[in-house]
């Protein structure tokens, strides 16, 4: 006979451990708040490396649960979901076009940044629009390399939430250059850099293929050849903001 008291203790132990692990993982990220957040973007430890890591994420819903899939095309490999995405756009069906939008791989960029409010090195996870504003600084003679530790610039992330999605159009560097911090602070920050490249864990081709075949079954006029065994019917949903931070981060370990 099952000892329910012992089973309940084990259940609490497992759920608390899982919850704690996810909380620890999320604590590494800088979650931008509505209004202004001041950060100092940090360079890579090695000069020949980029200060950011780039990925593209298919965020898919299956049985009411969302999961992130890092697209193989980031590494130059083939992606069944991207093949389906382009195929759906070649049809005349608006439903197919909506499905294409829901499975689209959306660019994501990870950067190491000092959160000025706390002084901690965090992972800044941003979409293409905000990343583009950061890159603009490098090609602007008034700013240049804003990650320079001696004469770079702090960056103001201004997050407005008036419409359906967050707006970052007012984000910009501070007007004057400055040292990132004291020598001791800089040394500590550079020793605390997160392994942002390790966040990009490319999804397995076979898993993506099964997902693509399952989505194809819901499309109109795609000529799909039967159900995929063991694959639940996915739901397309609506197009999502590439700045949906919390939902993105909670699934990032998957």
Model-derived features: positions:
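OB-fold ssDNA-binding interfaces and closely related basic DNA-contact patches used
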Residues: 1-142
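Extended acidic low-complexity intrinsically disordered regions
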Residues: 2-18, 235-254
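Serine/threonine-rich low-complexity intrinsically disordered regions
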Residues: 3, 21-24, 32, 44-45, ...
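Short linear sequence elements within intrinsically disordered, low-complexity coil regions
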Residues: 16, 30, 56-57, 173, ...
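Compositionally biased, intrinsically disordered low-complexity regions
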Residues: 22-23, 37, 66, 223-228, ...
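Intrinsic disorder/low-complexity signature
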Residues: 79, 145, 239-241
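Compact mixed alphabeta submodule
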Residues: 116-234
């Amino acid at each position: 006979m099952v000892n329910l008291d012992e089973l309940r203790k084990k259940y609490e132990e497992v759920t608390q451990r899982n919850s704690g692990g996810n909380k620890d993982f999320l604590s590494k990220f800088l979650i931008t708040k509505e209004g202004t957040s001041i950060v100092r973007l940090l360079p890579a430890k090695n000069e020949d490396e980029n200060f950011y890591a780039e990925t593209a994420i298919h965020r898919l819903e299956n049985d009411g649960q969302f999961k992130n899939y890092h697209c193989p095309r980031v590494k130059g490999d083939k992606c069944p979901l991207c093949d389906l995405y382009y195929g759906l756009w070649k049809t005349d069906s608006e439903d197919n076009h909506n499905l294409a939008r829901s499975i689209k791989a959306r660019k994501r960029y990870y950067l190491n940044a000092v959160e000025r409010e706390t002084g901690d090195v965090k992972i800044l996870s941003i979409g293409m629009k905000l990343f583009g504003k950061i890159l603009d600084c490098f090609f602007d003679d008034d700013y240049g390399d804003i990650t320079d530790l001696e004469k770079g610039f702090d960056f103001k992330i201004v997050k407005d939430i008036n419409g359906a999605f967050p707006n970052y159009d007012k984000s910009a560097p501070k007007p004057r250059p400055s040292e990132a911090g004291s020598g001791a602070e800089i040394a500590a920050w550079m020793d605390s850099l997160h392994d942002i490249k390790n966040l990009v864990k490319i999804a397995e081709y076979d898993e993506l293929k099964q997902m693509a075949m399952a989505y194809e079954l819901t499309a109109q006029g795609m000529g799909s050849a039967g159900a995929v065994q063991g694959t639940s019917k996915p739901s397309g949903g609506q197009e999502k903001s590439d700045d949906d931070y919390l939902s993105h981060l909670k699934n990032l370990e998957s």
